Amino acid sequence: ARMVTDSSVRFPRPASALLRMSARSVLSAPVVIAVVNTGDLLRRGTDLFQVDKEAAHDFFRTMEIQSSAAAVENLLLAATSLGLGSVWLGILFLIKDEVLDFLGEPTGEFMAVVPVGYPARPEHPGPKKQPLELKVRYLD
């Protein structure tokens, strides 16, 4: 929490407030999961698929980011299905170097931190959802 509080002063008020809220989430959660991209696909994908490294770099880099994001989303859905609360703390990417120092320099690229625990207010249903028709557009 001190790391986040100390670092938050470098940012404007909205980001600073989100960083402090993130610190509280991390401190209060019984489990905190850090998602780190090991870069295996970028390193081995060009050999595996026998494609030119230069041409394939952007493709494999994008796939690594998408895979990490999908893993985090699946983690959030699984936690919710078990009655647990979780949150994807993307704001911590603003202080990723400090987070990596705190995590002990894991091998790979920092992608996300997800605190998991029991909701403080289980009766609170979360934000009201808008009708699907307002969010989805079908193309003919």
Identify the function of each model-found stretch.
Residues 17-19, 99, 123:
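Glycine-rich, charged/polar anion/phosphate-binding loops
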Residues 1-31, 139-140:
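N-terminal amphipathic, basic helical "cap/leader" segment at the start of enzyme domains
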Residues 109-140:
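C-terminal helix-cap and adjacent tail motif
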Residues 33, 39, 49, 53-100:
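Small-aliphatic-rich amphipathic alpha-helix that forms the alpha element of a beta-alpha
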Residues 1, 38-41, 120:
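Short, charged/polar surface micro-motifs in flexible loops or helix N-caps
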Residues 25-27, 103-106, 127-130:
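Solvent-exposed alpha-helices and their adjacent loops that cap or buttress functional pockets
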Residues 30-32, 86, 109-111:
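Structural motif
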Residues 20, 35, 40-45:
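Carboxylate-rich helix-loop segments that flank metal/cofactor sites and access channels
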